[in-house]
């Protein structure tokens, strides 16, 4: 009976490892496929005001706020908003997007506008 228990434990451990690989595999792959785009905010203006990214790939926006005051990255078309405090960086993860133009702005300074062009 001892050997049956050992075989059962070995089989159970193997199944746990295999199931773990299935759970981790897709998320690691999705992170590898993501495209990172960097943008800065200085004097309440996006720099650059127009950014580009590849279509049909997840996008990571790295927003560096160089101002001392907070800003709020917002986009109605992307359905995101993110407050980035002064002198810090924020990250926004976007799903894979279809080709097109996606407007964004600083909700605290609405005159500050930009555009994400996905090609």
Spans of model-derived segments:
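Bacterial N-terminal signal peptides that target proteins for export
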Residues: 2-15
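C-terminal segment of classical bacterial N-terminal signal peptides
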Residues: 18-27
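Extracellular/periplasmic metallocenter environments
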Residues: 29-38, 45, 84-119
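Structural beta-strand segments of beta-rich domains
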Residues: 49, 57-61
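Beta-strand-rich interaction surfaces with strong enrichment in secreted/lumenal proteins
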Residues: 49-51, 79-83
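Short beta-strand/loop motifs in extracellular/secreted proteins, especially
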Residues: 59, 69-71, 114
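Asparagine-centered strand-capping/turn motif at beta-strand->loop junctions
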Residues: 63-65
């Amino acid at each position: 009976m001892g050997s049956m228990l050992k075989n059962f434990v070995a089989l159970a451990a193997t199944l746990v490892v295999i199931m773990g690989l299935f759970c981790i595999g897709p998320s690691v792959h999705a992170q590898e496929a993501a495209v990172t785009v960097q943008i800065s905010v200085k004097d309440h203006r996006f720099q650059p005001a127009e950014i580009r990214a590849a279509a049909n790939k997840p996008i990571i926006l790295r927003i560096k706020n160089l101002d001392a005051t907070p800003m709020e990255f917002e986009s109605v078309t992307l359905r995101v908003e993110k407050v980035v405090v002064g002198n810090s960086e924020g990250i926004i993860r976007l799903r894979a997007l279809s080709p097109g133009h996606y407007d964004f702005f600083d909700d605290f300074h609405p005159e500050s506008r930009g555009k994400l062009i996905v090609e």
